[in-house]
């Protein structure tokens, strides 16, 4: 019975990891779009249109978004690794049960 509970736990964790990975990929995509938007915005702002401080603020915002993208990419890799480990545990459990 404990083995069955472990299988259920691992399967549920695997499904949760799938959802988290999809959510994380969406965050990467969204923040990448923001980085592109801010990069384009920087190209259009001219010194005679607005003060240099605005450019500095936008550059800082872009850097923040780039950092977020990097963090989400790292998190995605960690979640994928854990999902693969869960798949191995589940497969191993199924093989043990079949062998019984």
UniProtKB/Swiss-Prot annotation:
| Record carries keyword Ion transport | no
Q: What residues form the membrane-spanning segments? A: none
Q: Does the keyword Cytoplasm apply?
A: yes
Q: Which InterPro entries match?
A: DUF496
What GO cellular component is one of the record's annotations?
A: cytosol
Q: Keywords for this entry?
A: Cytoplasm
Predominant location category: cytoplasm
Into which family does the record put it? Belongs to the pole-localizer TmaR family.
State the name under which the record lists this protein: Pole-localizer protein TmaR
Question: What species is given as this protein's source?
Answer: Psychromonas ingrahamii (strain DSM 17664 / CCUG 51855 / 37)
């Amino acid at each position: 019975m404990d083995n069955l509970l472990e299988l259920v736990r691992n399967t549920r964790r695997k499904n949760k990891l799938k959802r988290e990975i999809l959510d994380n990929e969406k965050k990467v995509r969204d923040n990448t779009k923001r980085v592109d938007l801010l990069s384009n915005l920087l190209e259009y702002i001219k010194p005679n249109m607005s003060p240099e401080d605005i450019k500095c603020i936008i550059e800082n915002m872009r850097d923040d978004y780039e950092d977020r993208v990097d963090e989400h990419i790292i998190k995605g890799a960690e979640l994928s690794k854990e999902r693969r480990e869960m798949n191995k545990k589940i497969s191993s459990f199924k093989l043990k049960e079949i062998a019984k």
